[in-house]
Amino acid sequence: MGARSRRNHGHLPQMKTRGRFLDFLSHSRPIKEGGERSNGPFSWTSCRAMYSVFREELEAERVARWEKRQSESSTEDTSEELQRRLQEVTEEVELLRTELEVTHRHLEGKHEALRILQGQAILDKATCHTKMLLQKSEERTKALEKEVNALQWEITFNQVQFKNVENSWSLKYERVLAENEALKKGLEEKMKEHQKQRTENASLSQKCLELLSMLSAKERRDFQRTQPSCSLRTDGSALELAVYGACQCNSNGGEPCSCARSAAASRKQVLQLKQELEQQQKRKDEAYVMMDAFRIAFEQQLRRVGENVLRQAETDRHQTHNQRHEKGKQWSLTVGERLKKILPTTSDGRIPSDSSETLHMLLDLLNDKEEALAHQRKVSYMLARNTENLEKRLLMQLEELDVSHEESKTKTVASEDYEWSRDCRCCADSCGSQHLSVPDDKQTYKANQPPSENRPETKPDNKDA
């Protein structure tokens, strides 16, 4: 009984140490029932810490046992007790071995659980990342689908617009082509009409030059003065074109019609009226110049007389009666001495002694001088106008002489061309006849020449010029 009680008493500290070790393990990692994980945080316990705790507990138990053995050795220290203790020690060693194996297995299970948890955590992270990537990719695909749909709609809309624009431009192009063809036809017709009018104008200008060459210099000058102003752009005014279109006379005989005669008479009347108007304008300008000269002289005379009167009134206001009398005498004496050579003498050869008479004489002389100067100014203006008119006339005469020379040259060239064409025709007729004959040069030349009566004079009239 005593041995069993000792064994039981010896097992008590062992059970206590095992219970403390299990409590330590439970505190290090609490495990739920059914093998489920706890929601609390996982705390890692190293093998060294567990071994140090286990070793401390064994040392404490050994110290307690050694004390007990010393206390018991004093009472009973026999061989049986030693055997019993040896057996207990061996049992304890086996028990410790089993506990170590259990702890090793428990640690291996913990390591496996850790590996599983780490794998699950990695899988959770990977799954979260993949879920986020999938969500982002889905959002991107949705946005891209929206953009693609919008772009497809824009493409279809632009294609429809391009088709409409292409159709409108094709219609415009066809219309412009039709208009261009119509304009080309109209332009060709206008060009033909313009060519005809140019040929007619050239023939008319040639006839006009021939007629001008037959006129004298005075008649030519009158004609050029009354000639209507025409330019290359506008060949005449609307009124002239209406008059030309109203004339329906047939001048087949080469004689001028009544419309042409009336037009020439009206041009002569216009020339006469222009000359009269120019003369009236010249007279008007001369009258204006004379009026301005007399007006300026009269204004200057009035201004000077007024200034003299004002000066005399101011001097009379500031002087007394005696001073006036004395200064009047002195002034009359000085003026008489100074103006002896200037003032005109009387029939007796004496100068008037009265100061008022001398003043009036001086004013009369001054007025005469001013009138003479105004007359000279007017005459100078008139002479300048006359010189300008003479210069203009001289330039016009020189221009007329140049024009007459040019007309004579053109007339000679035209006569030579006419003779050459006539000779060519005669040669063609002679070659085409059956009997070939070579005429004399002098005879053919005399025959081809126009008569002297019908030939216009090429030399200008020097007397008229």
Swiss-Prot record:
Q: Where in the cell is it found?
A: Cytoplasm
InterPro entries from the xrefs?
CCDC125
Residue spans with biased composition (Basic and acidic residues)? 454-465
What domain of life is recorded for the organism? Eukaryota
Region listing for Disordered, in residue ranges = 65-84, 432-465
Chain segments annotated as coiled-coil in the UniProt record: 69-208, 260-295
- One GO location term (cellular component): cytoplasm
Spell out where the chain crosses the membrane. none
Record-level GO BP terms: negative regulation of cell motility; negative regulation of Rho protein signal transduction
The protein depicted here goes by the name: Coiled-coil domain-containing protein 125
Q: What is the lineage of its organism?
A: Eukaryota, Metazoa, Chordata, Craniata, Vertebrata
